[in-house]
């Protein structure tokens, strides 16, 4: 690290702010540092069979000189007649016109093809947006023997704030997600809804928001799942306007004030001043109850907690990226304070500080909260109960995530023990060949289950007290996944260095990283922290070689292989290919009898189901695409891993698998993440770990552990929320 000179095996890139050397260096070909990106977004430029561009292409030349006006050779007859000269000139002119015509046709065809591709891309994006729209009719909810209606239970008590539905089933386009499940949501509690991806957690939130699962009419429900639509309204106004009642009362008060006096001070509508005054007083009382005087201040406080500076708060919402607009949607929900707030992965678009602020804010939430999250620390801090979606059912556990884990493990052992006894008895009954004996074993098991369920309910236990009808014991099915990165070959240090590097974007005068002096070797563990927009991803791009420093020097070993993961890489996958085709194209040198089977085995290790291996990547979920990217990184056999928000598309089991794999990996790891637990796992060894703080255009080392850095942030945030 620092200004240490590179050894002979290292490649050095020097960049000066000005001069011939800087110009010369900028023209050098930039080496790719990630094998997985080699063809990520390349297109096949070969014309397709039967395409218009091929049918109108120029005829094949018989010689490389065809169509080129050449000077006459020394052997040509100098005594050519004028007629021959004119004929020759005419032939040259005709050939030139034909060539220009061919070029013109080719240009037109190229433009047509580009226009066609643009239209196809727009159509694909439109289809994608259409597919993302929620189709209410695609979901079927059956409660007991009746199907739910969108408006909820007409007989709901106006004072009821709890939601209790027994024995309901949910299916989506024919796929059963929940079977004979029961839900119990008590007012004032904060629930964490957990389970593997694709099992129906987000669907359950949507059904509650749509009231297809009956919700008492007096309970207002708000689900935060989509970013706010960008327009000219400022971020602050967008948050305040989320309270429609407040906005309406303000408009009524303003209109009444205007109508109460004309240009001469008399009432335009002819109403008595006393009546107008009474109406205004009533409106002001209602506005005071809604906290109108402090509305903007409260909205500003929420936005600040989510990372918006004062300048950002007055910017138009249309000027923000999707991630920031998602924060505005979250701020709107927190400002409105619905009776039932539903959050689906709220931390995905937040930096670490914003996540810690949201934890502190939600811990003070007095109403009901149901949140889907794969962040263990977030669930431990915020939640008072856990709902586990497992095996098409909902299991309730008191306490936070740690409490759930201990309860879950105990439950798993008990269930497997009961199954082993039942399975042994059933096998013995089958050996007798007596079907009646088999039915007796099954009935006895059901009776025992019903007795235990009744006993648990009478004791007031929260685990499955509203459970489905008793069934015979089944083998407990756990979802598990294992990630693995191969052992890297040893390289002589230093592997990668940035020495006195500065960087700025040509079109971003407000952004600059200055005097960056960092390095990475085998075994190095780095967590990059700092607010969104400070330059964390830019720093990773500089380390990867995807950006060239404006000033300073980058050194890297010539044999260095870097594995790069970004939350946006899943969008760069070639959607028309299958995962197997994609990986074989990037990594053709596979060992074994069958290259395809070798690739499928690797995909399986990273948790991609076998039926997705040969499906187009476009049909995969975000989490499944992430698994394809991680598989590709593993196949590139990297020495250093650069990971930018790797948990956004992963469920909890996959995050744990990633943490285990990084713990075993002997190469270098540089991590940007809002997941505190993952950072703690990666930076567990203090001697090998570093915390780089990117803020105010600089990269500084935090003199302590990640836990100490986190505690400092939490103290600051608590003081802010207490104000």
Curated annotation (Swiss-Prot):
InterPro entries hit by this protein: AAA+_ATPase, ABC_transporter-like_ATP-bd, ABC_transporter-like_CS, ABCF_EF3_subfamily, P-loop_NTPase
Start and end residues of each stretch annotated as Disordered: 1-117, 256-275, 427-472
A single cellular component GO annotation: cytosol
Start-end of Polar residues biased regions: 50-65
Residues forming coiled coils: none
Entry-linked Gene3D superfamilies: P-loop containing nucleotide triphosphate hydrolases (3.40.50.300)
A GO MF term: ATP binding
Domain spans labelled ABC transporter: 163-423, 496-721
Residues given in the record as ATP binding sites: 195-202, 530-537
Family according to the record: Belongs to the ABC transporter superfamily. ABCF family. EF3 (TC 3.A.1.121) subfamily.
Protein known as: ABC transporter F family member 4
Organism: Arabidopsis thaliana (Mouse-ear cress)
């Amino acid at each position: 690290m620092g200004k240490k000179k590179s050894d002979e095996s290292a490649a050095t890139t020097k960049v000066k702010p000005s001069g011939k050397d800087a110009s010369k260096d900028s023209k050098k070909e930039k080496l790719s540092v990630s094998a997985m990106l080699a063809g990520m977004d390349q297109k096949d430029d070969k014309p397709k069979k039967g395409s218009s561009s091929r049918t109108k292409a120029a005829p094949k030349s018989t010689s490389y000189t065809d169509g080129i006006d050449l000077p006459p050779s020394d052997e040509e007859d100098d005594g050519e007649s004028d007629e021959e000269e004119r004929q020759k000139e005419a032939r040259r002119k005709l050939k030139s016109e034909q060539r220009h015509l061919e070029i013109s046709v080719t240009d037109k065809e190229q433009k047509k093809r580009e226009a066609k591709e643009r239209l196809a891309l727009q159509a694909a994006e439109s289809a994608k947006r259409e597919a993302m729209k929620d189709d209410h009719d695609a979901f079927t909810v059956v409660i007991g023997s009746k199907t739910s209606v969108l408006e909820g239970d007409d007989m709901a008590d106006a004072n009821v704030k709890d939601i209790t539905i027994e024995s309901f089933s949910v299916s989506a386009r024919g796929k059963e997600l929940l079977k004979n499940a029961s839900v119990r949501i008590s007012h004032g509690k904060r629930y964490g809804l957990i389970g593997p991806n694709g099992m129906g957690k987000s669907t359950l939130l949507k059904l509650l928001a749509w009231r297809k699962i009956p919700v008492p009419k007096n309970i207002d429900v708000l689900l935060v799942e989509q970013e706010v639509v960008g327009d000219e309204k400022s971020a602050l106004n967008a948050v305040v306007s989320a309270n429609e009642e407040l906005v309406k009362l303000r408009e009524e008060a303003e209109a009444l004030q205007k109508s109460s006096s004309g240009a001469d001070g008399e009432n335009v509508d002819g109403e008595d001043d006393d009546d107008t005054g009474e109406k205004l007083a009533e409106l002001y009382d209602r506005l005071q109850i809604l906290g109108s005087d402090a509305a903007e201040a409260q909205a500003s406080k929420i936005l600040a907690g989510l990372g918006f500076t004062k300048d950002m708060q007055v910017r138009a919402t249309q000027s923000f990226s999707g991630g920031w607009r998602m924060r505005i949607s979250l701020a709107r929900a927190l400002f409105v304070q619905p009776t039932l707030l539903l959050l689906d992965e709220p931390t995905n678009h937040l930096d670490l500080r914003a996540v810690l602020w949201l934890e502190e804010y939600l811990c003070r939430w007095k109403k009901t909260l149901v949140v889907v999250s794969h962040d263990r620390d977030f669930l431990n801090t915020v939640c008072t109960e856990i709902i586990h979606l497992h095996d098409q059912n909902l299991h309730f556990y008191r306490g936070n995530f740690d409490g759930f884990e201990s309860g879950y493990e105990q439950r798993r052992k008990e269930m497997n023990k009961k199954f082993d006894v039942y399975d042994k008895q059933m096998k013995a009954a089958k050996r007798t060949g007596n079907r009646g004996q088999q039915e007796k074993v099954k009935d006895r098991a059901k009776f025992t289950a019903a007795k235990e369920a009744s006993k648990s309910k009478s004791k007031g236990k929260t685990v499955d007290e509203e459970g489905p009808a008793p069934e015979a014991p089944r083998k407990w099915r756990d979802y598990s996944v294992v990630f693995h990165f191969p052992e890297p070959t040893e390289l002589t240090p230093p592997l990668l260095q940035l020495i006195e590097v500065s960087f700025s974007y040509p079109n971003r005068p407000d952004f600059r990283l200055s005097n960056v002096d960092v390095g990475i070797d085998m075994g190095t563990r780095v967590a990059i922290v700092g607010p969104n927009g400070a330059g964390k991803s830019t720093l990773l791009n500089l380390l990867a070689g995807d950006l060239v420093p404006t000033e300073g020097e980058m050194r890297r070993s010539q044999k260095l292989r870097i594995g790069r993961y970004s939350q946006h890489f899943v969008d760069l996958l070639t959607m028309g290919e299958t995962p197997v085709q994609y990986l074989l194209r990037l990594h053709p040198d596979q060992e074994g009898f069958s290259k395809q089977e070798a690739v499928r085995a690797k995909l399986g290790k990273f948790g991609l189901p076998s039926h997705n291996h040969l499906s187009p990547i476009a049909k995969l979920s975000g989490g499944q695409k992430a698994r394809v990217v991680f598989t590709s990184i593993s196949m590139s056999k990297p020495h250093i891993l650069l990971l930018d928000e790797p948990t956004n598309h992963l469920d909890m089991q996959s995050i744990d698998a990633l943490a285990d794999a990084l713990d075993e990996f002997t190469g270098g790891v540089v991590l940007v993440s809002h997941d505190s637990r993952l950072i703690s796992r990666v930076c567990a060894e203090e001697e090998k770990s570093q915390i780089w703080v990117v803020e105010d255009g600089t990269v500084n080392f935090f003199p302590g552990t990640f836990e100490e850095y986190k505690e400092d942030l939490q103290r600051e945030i608590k003081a802010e929320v207490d104000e």
